[in-house]
A protein has these predicted regions:
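Catalytic nucleotidyl-transfer cores of nucleotide-processing enzymes
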Residues: 15-18, 22-24, 190-205
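Substrate-gripping "pore-loop 1 plus following alpha2 helix"
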Residues: 125-138, 165-185, 228-237
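Phosphate-sensing "switch" segment of ASCE/P-loop ATPases
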Residues: 188-191, 207-241
Length: 241
């Protein structure tokens, strides 16, 4: 039951970046699995994941990682660290994570599965928003970024050049300026990890060191064919891993 006489500031909502709300419990990620506690309205959380933590299907997920990353355990550990950071509402990696490789290598399957698991904590942004070729007003799209912990852009056009200014704004801890349609402009502190999965590496300004240090390329070199190629595999992983 709501009480119109009680008001809170929007900045009080989802204010604790380490709290992760799941269907079964709210987790304080500083304490790991031991940080589980009952849901509380006093946490002012507005988002929730699609699933709760558990070990069911763990081996299926590990086998999938081994296939996609060709048994490169160092790479697997790094990618899992990135996914863990994406569950926290704080920018730890001021970079654009580029998942790169030819088709049929599992990159879209992997990131779509992670996005599905994170539920309302995850969002999408058009890949062309990150390029110099984007001529539209991107502030309404920026407005949808607020509060997301994982932000995914998919499939950049071949030969597209990154917009240094936009990438720097989305890959930093500085305030992001946005504007919903027919609403007043506002700013917010970003809390997301930004991932671009693509078959084509974007072009980058050769003279701007600031943009180069914000790019991390994760190779997806596997070729998944035959029996290992399952339609809608991201959904299968979501349901079973």
């Amino acid at each position: 039951e709501s009480n119109p006489m009680l008001e809170i500031s929007p900045r009080d909502l989802d204010a604790d970046c380490f709290l992760l709300c799941t269907p079964e419990a709210t987790y304080d990620l500083r304490k790991g699995m031991a940080g589980a506690r009952e849901h509380s309205a006093n946490d002012f959380i507005t988002k929730i994941t699609s699933v709760s933590p558990g070990i069911k299907g763990q081996q299926l997920w590990l086998d999938n990682l081994s296939l996609i990353f060709q048994k490169d355990q160092q790479l697997i550990d790094y990618v899992q660290m990135i996914c863990g950071l994406a569950a926290i509402g704080k920018v730890y990696v001021e970079a654009l994570i580029i998942a790169y490789g030819d088709g049929r290598n599992g990159k879209s399957t992997f990131w779509n599965a992670i996005s599905h698991v994170l539920g309302l904590y995850s969002g999408n942004i058009s890949a062309d928003t990150l390029t110099v070729g984007c001529r539209r007003n991107i502030k309404p799209e920026m407005a949808e970024v607020k509060g997301k912990r994982l932000l995914i852009a998919a499939e950049m056009q071949e030969g597209a050049r990154l917009n240094d200014s936009t990438v720097k704004q989305l890959c930093s801890t500085d305030e992001v300026f946005a504007e919903k349609k027919y609403k007043d402009p506002f700013s917010f502190k970003p809390c997301h990890t930004l991932v671009l999965y693509t078959n084509h590496l974007p072009r980058v300004s050769a003279s701007d060191d600031g943009i180069w240090r914000r790019l991390i390329v994760i190779p997806f070199g596997a070729k998944i064919e035959g029996k290992t190629d399952i339609k809608n595999y991201s959904e299968y992983l979501y349901e079973n891993a």
